[in-house]
Amino acid sequence: MRKSGWGYDFETRERFVNVLAKRATWRVRPYAPSDETEILALCTKIFGSTSTLKEWRWRHLENPVGEALVFVAEERDSGKLIGHAAAVPIDFKVGDFTRKGFFVVDSAVDQVYRGKGISAVLTVAISKESCKRDGGFGCGLPNEQAYFSTLKTGAIRLFTMSLFVRVLDWPGLLRARLRSAFLAKATGGLIRLFQRRKQPRSHPRFIIEEVGRFGSPVDDLWQRSASRFPIAAIRTATTLNWRYFECPGSPYRAFSISTDGNWQGYIVIRRVQKWGLKLGTVVDLFVDPDCAQAGELLLYHADATFRADGVDAVWGLFSAPERYRKLLRDAGFFKIPKLKAVRPFHFVAEFVTVDHLRPDLAARDGALLRQEDQWFLSLGDTDLA
């Protein structure tokens, strides 16, 4: 857990931001509906984003948990939009209570205006507004370029999410990296000999079905299982439908597994084309902790679905208890080690404002929130899938 710099003291940070704002030729303000076109143009310019206005409104305005916090930076004289930050709300179960987190999905400053403190002021604006919303806090998965600057404004690294990969077509994967098709096929066949896994035993009492909408069965599953997850994004039919089925052009497929009419778990998957490969993504996997076989069967079903689609490899991103990690290992996934070429997925959170203004919440939840092994987070809880 990294903690250093001016951003970790509330009053020092406030003085810094106030002085900066008074001297600046720009200002930060809450978003207005007329800003949407400029926000999209800025994100396209900086990130190459292809998001449409419909997608932007779905993510920022239609979330059943609440509207996103959106701030913009503009030139004082011209009104030109030069920066933007947004965070979408997530209801977290934290122990026996509910806390609102605000996951930063966009943070962008025009290259011409970088180094002037705009990003810091936008971040603090989100922090202060988060606290006003039921004692909320900001969080996110900053990329490598933004990670250290995020820490300087008061965030701390809570944990690093684990990247799990399972290769389905070794010859195909190697062919994308090797010029020789013969060598790729031979090497891939040899690797497969050492990576055969045992098919999980099916059981007639388990029924796997594709889900077109989530309903009361997933609410019942969450109510039965929630106590086993100290910290997790609350999973309800309403939020899951918004996340996976109501997004424009939804690319997701979901499958449930049940016994005697009761859901024991679900899995959400999608397929993407990248680096000349067909990649399958385990976006979300949630199972009753007392029914490990349900998780095994869901992963095997996803495996078969991906194979039928010609997928080369499958990946997922989790911060999860050991029982989940074992489930993935048994299904043939391996955890990617720390490598220079692989981006680390550091999950950060900022508690400076809420700890200062709501010491009651800091006393109640602060220690638990900072315990890495108490969190359950999947790729679907982030903005990466």
Where are these regions (language model features)?
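Conserved acetyl-CoA-binding loop-helix of GNAT-fold acetyltransferases
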Residues: 109, 114-128, 292-304
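Active-site-proximal structural scaffolding
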Residues: 49, 66, 119, 131, ...
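A conserved beta-strand-loop-helix scaffold within acyl/acetyltransferase catalytic domains
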Residues: 23-108, 210-287
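Short, surface-exposed acidic/glycine-rich loop or hinge patches that mediate macromolecular interfaces
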Residues: 33-34, 112, 144, 319
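Short acidic, glycine/Ser/Thr-rich loop/turn "cap" segments at secondary-structure junctions
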Residues: 104-113, 133-138
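Active-site/acyl-donor-binding loops of N-acyltransferases
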Residues: 2-23, 89, 136-195, 243-246, ...
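Extended, charge-rich helix/loop segments that form flexible
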Residues: 177-221
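Secondary-structure boundary elements
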Residues: 78, 128-135
